[in-house]
């Protein structure tokens, strides 16, 4: 765990769950637990048709396993396409694919430590059936949960971006959709506070206004090292504590 504000990091104790040969992918998410003024890390390990989860708590410096219980119960978890979780509205979110049902958003409430389903918009499945989906990801656009999909056109020289915004959190009927044409997108890194998309295209890393389609090329020459761009907030977390080190220590 690293706090860039004070340039200190903490080596975490080893997790309980191991990534065995049959494990398919690993997902992490970090969240602030407001009720206890604490931080938690969610770790999901997916296997062939199932998944396990564990939570690290900063105050106790320990991991413990949590059970994934969903209503209706999901028996077959096939794949989680992203390696990180999005923190929004007190919960961590990730897209989940199931072997026996349509994909959905898996949310983990940091306060009560319960998993819940948030269904993807119905119109997305129509897009998925008729389109070549290149990227699908979660983001926060102007305070609302958003589901963003980038599709390639047949010529693979251009594409389209579909954006669904959940106007009322957790309410399936509140998904609203907007589709805009755009040049081929190579990668997506999230959204800025004002709702612009951070994407990589043929010109490099750009910030794109999906309403006006105005693009601003960012002063980052090579985005290959980038994987995820969360919002930053200054904090004194890790100022004191066990196993905390400075960036400048040998």
Predicted regions and their residues:
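Short, conserved recognition motifs on repeat-domain binding surfaces
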Residues: 1-250
